[in-house]
Amino acid sequence: MQQVSEWYESEARVEGDGFWLRVHGDSMTAAAGMSIPEGTLVLFDTGREPKNGSLVIAKLVDANEATFKKLIIDGGQKYLKGLNPAYPLIPIDGNCRIIGVAVQTMMNLV
């Protein structure tokens, strides 16, 4: 079990276990519309059912870390998509497990 290094409070309604992760990288940074830049804290809910358009944390089978992406469901096929259009769609075909759905963000402005 990993040691907890920081505690954050939230009034968000969480249906399962909740945990915060800090965004690393620019795959969720967009030039227009919703953007979640590097350094932002995101609260994930493990008990919430992911839907089309949900922002999710997922563990890819062949990766050592989790990925934070938007879930796209199109014609029965599921994909993970960054908000940054420079990143490709990741087809979901048994190659990942969705761990939780994002319910809140928190970031410092200075």
Where are the language model's segments positioned?
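Residues located in well-ordered beta-strands
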Residues: 22, 43, 67-70, 101
